[in-house]
Swiss-Prot record:
Catalytic reactions of this protein: 7-aminomethyl-7-carbaguanine + guanosine(34) in tRNA = 7-aminomethyl-7-carbaguanosine(34) in tRNA + guanine
Pathway(s) per entry: tRNA modification; tRNA-queuosine biosynthesis
Free-text comment on the cofactor: Binds 1 zinc ion per subunit.
Lineage: Bacteria, Pseudomonadati, Pseudomonadota, Betaproteobacteria, Neisseriales
Swiss-Prot/TrEMBL GO biological process terms: queuosine biosynthetic process; tRNA wobble guanine modification; tRNA-guanine transglycosylation
Active site, renumbered: 90 (proton acceptor), 265 (nucleophile)
Matches recorded under InterPro entries: ArchSynthase1/Queuine_TRR, TGT, TGT-like_sf, tRNA_ribo_trans-like
Entry cofactors: Zn(2+)
Enzyme Commission number(s) of this protein: 2.4.2.29
Protein name, entry field: Queuine tRNA-ribosyltransferase
Similarity comment: Belongs to the queuine tRNA-ribosyltransferase family.
Binding-site residues for substrate, renumbered to this chain: 90-94, 144, 188, 215
Origin superkingdom: Bacteria
Quaternary state and interactors: Homodimer. Within each dimer, one monomer is responsible for RNA recognition and catalysis, while the other monomer binds to the replacement base PreQ1.
Length: 371
């Protein structure tokens, strides 16, 4: 089940509601990443507290461990991990194709060795759909070939054509399995605008209920990523949700929304938090730096998260230096809360027709830097 309602547009920025089997999502939305079925350093109550509306699970990793036979006993991923709101799962393709020296790609699918025990495994569109059906995620993704950013035009064309054939197979398998959830297609084409348009045209013929932009933030220069966003975002079908995969910084989210993106995921806020890199309204803060040793202020005096309301920079500095788990937890709560606040503010700005003003103020504040 998927119903997308577009409430308001301000330029290309959009404000909508996405209705899924496990609840409604207000867009634009950021999805914290729970690779192994948990968002690192967060429990489900923490996620509720920061107002996370949907999280992402990783098909590849959950397939390998704990395995489908375990998740199936709980009726799907929601029951297994104790999360009652929507979940999106990726197809597993990105992780498999990252194993470049351990995998073999054919039209049928991809053969690879398990990095856990060396077992020979095979992932195809049909198997990916089977896995995601067992996981019972609210949004599943087609299996696609993740084209590297530096691909030649001919490589990119062959890759996107394979992805389109796999999209058709994914959709058929999804329907044959009578999966009651939603399946998104993925626009590929590397850094070639005309190939992106070719990919989009093929996906539109398959009539997926939502579309994602894949193959960005895979090593290409930032200006190239933004060029592709400018080219693809505004031409995605207006009546369907638009998902930018694996992106990114706070500035990337704002740029994406400005060019028609509704959904984002990225490990950056959680990974950076564990490394002591904190995002604030006035730039980024490295809590491990010695200057915070005696600082009684919170991370961000305007922030309402649990970490900022209760603890000083000095304490967080100490926790990070000591390698305490609590430090990673508090840092992660803050970073994910900050991302959720950005999204909420963008939703409100679009509703009020003031997105451009909000965007300008956001960049001005971020450029100021922290003290």
């Amino acid at each position: 089940m998927l119903k997308f309602t577009l409430h308001k547009k301000d330029g290309y920025a959009r404000r909508g509601t996405l209705e899924l089997n496990h609840g409604k999502i207000e867009t634009p939305v950021f999805m914290p990443v729970g690779t192994y079925g948990s968002v690192k350093a967060m429990n489900p109550q923490n996620l509720h507290d920061i107002k996370a509306q949907i999280i992402l699970g990783n098909t590849y990793h959950l397939w390998l461990r704990p395995g489908l036979e375990v998740v199936e006993q709980f009726g799907g991923l929601h029951g297994f991990i104790g999360w009652d709101k929507p979940i999106l799962t990726d197809s597993g393709g990105f992780q498999v194709f990252s194993l470049s020296d351990m995998r073999k790609l054919t039209e049928e699918g991809c053969t690879f060795k398990s990095p856990i025990n060396g077992d020979k495994l095979f992932l195809s569109p049909e198997i990916s759909m089977k896995i995601q059906t067992v996981l019972n995620s609210d949004i599943a993704m087609q299996l696609d070939e993740c084209t590297p950013g530096e691909a030649t035009r001919e490589q990119a064309r062959k890759s996107l054509q394979m992805s389109l054939r796999w999209a058709e197979r994914s959709k058929k398998a999804f329907e044959d399995l009578k999966n009651p959830n939603a399946l998104f297609g993925i626009v590929q084409g590397a850094m070639y605008e005309d190939l992106r348009e070719e990919s989009l045209k093929g996906l539109e013929e398959l009539d997926f209920p939502g579309l994602a932009i894949g193959g960005l933030s895979v090593g290409e220069p930032k200006p190239e990523m933004y060029r592709m966003l400018r080219a693809v975002g505004p031409i995605l079908p207006e009546h369907k949700p638009h998902y930018l995969m694996g992106v990114g910084t706070p500035e990337d989210l704002v740029y994406g929304v400005a060019h028609g993106v509704d959904m984002f995921d990225c490990v950056m806020p959680t990974r950076n938090a564990r490394n002591g890199w904190l995002f604030t309204r006035f730039g980024d803060l490295k809590i491990k730096n010695a200057k915070h040793k005696l600082d009684k202020r919170p991370i961000d005096e305007s922030c309402t998260c649990y970490a900022c309301q209760n603890f000083s920079r000095a304490y967080l500095h100490h926790l990070h230096r000591a390698g305490e788990i609590l430090g990673a937890q508090l840092n992660t709560i803050h970073n994910l809360h900050f991302y959720q606040v950005i999204m909420a503010e963008m939703r409100e700005a679009v509703e009020q027709g003031k997105f451009a003003d909000w965007q300008a103020q956001f960049h001005e504040n971020r450029a100021r830097g922290t003290d």
